[in-house]
């Protein structure tokens, strides 16, 4: 069966600086949202869902997008709810105890390379079984406190969503990911500028930004070639 391809939203990005509006008493939510630990911790996932169940469904279970969209009134209500604050602090204490536990320095360190990682549906950098397996390896390495570092690629479009045309044909819809609303962070150099890796290819270089995903205790570094330094041919790498 032939599947048609449709890029549903070609992105036009502009750089902006956004100041967080999350109250101080809820700041720990931002830290937890930026670590994929919540993806395999039911208690943490349920905590985010209960902040605003309707909005949680709307943002497709993305805690970073959830916190960005919570209204001022909702944030104020959460700050004044002692039961909610107590639960958030309880889960945050468990999270900090988990991530602050150092690996056994006598065990060998591991560098894990893969083209895709299936960590959560929120981060579309996988397409099948290989990605799910790689994602599970990183999660298990985190739970087992293995000194591991993952390396991969950050894809702008990732895997596609399927829809049907009027005549019943399958259509592959590629929706661009907005990196600013994902549980990832840009890696900076010693001068505070975005870190760039220059990778030799044929007779020239491909330039890649570096992003970091916190997978519990395991850092995953992703290369991003979709930038103005590269040609239109190289940007989709």
PLM regions: where:
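Catalytic cores of carbohydrate-active enzymes across secretory and cytosolic contexts
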Residues: 1-237
């Amino acid at each position: 069966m032939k599947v048609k391809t449709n890029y549903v939203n070609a992105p036009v990005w502009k750089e902006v600086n956004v100041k967080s509006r999350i109250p101080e008493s809820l700041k720990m939510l931002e830290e937890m949202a930026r670590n994929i630990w919540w993806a395999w911790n039911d208690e943490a996932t349920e905590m985010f869902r209960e902040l605003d169940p309707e909005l949680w469904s709307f943002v497709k279970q993305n805690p970073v997008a959830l916190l960005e969209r919570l209204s001022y009134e909702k944030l104020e209500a959460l700050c004044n709810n002692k039961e909610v604050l107590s639960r958030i602090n309880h889960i945050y204490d468990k999270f900090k105890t988990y991530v602050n536990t150092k690996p056994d320095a006598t065990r060998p360190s591991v560098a894990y390379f893969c083209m895709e990682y299936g960590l959560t549906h929120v981060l579309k950098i996988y397409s099948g079984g290989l990605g799910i397996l790689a994602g599970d390896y990183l999660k298990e390495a985190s739970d087992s406190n293995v000194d591991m570092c993952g390396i991969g690629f950050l894809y702008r479009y990732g895997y596609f969503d399927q829809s049907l045309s009027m005549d019943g044909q399958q259509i592959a819809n590629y929706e661009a990911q907005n990196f600013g609303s994902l549980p990832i962070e840009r890696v900076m150099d010693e001068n505070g500028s975005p870190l760039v890796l220059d990778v030799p290819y044929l007779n020239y270089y491909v330039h890649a930004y570096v992003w970091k995903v916190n997978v519990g205790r395991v850092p995953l570094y992703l290369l991003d070639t979709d930038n103005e330094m590269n040609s239109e041919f190289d940007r989709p790498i």
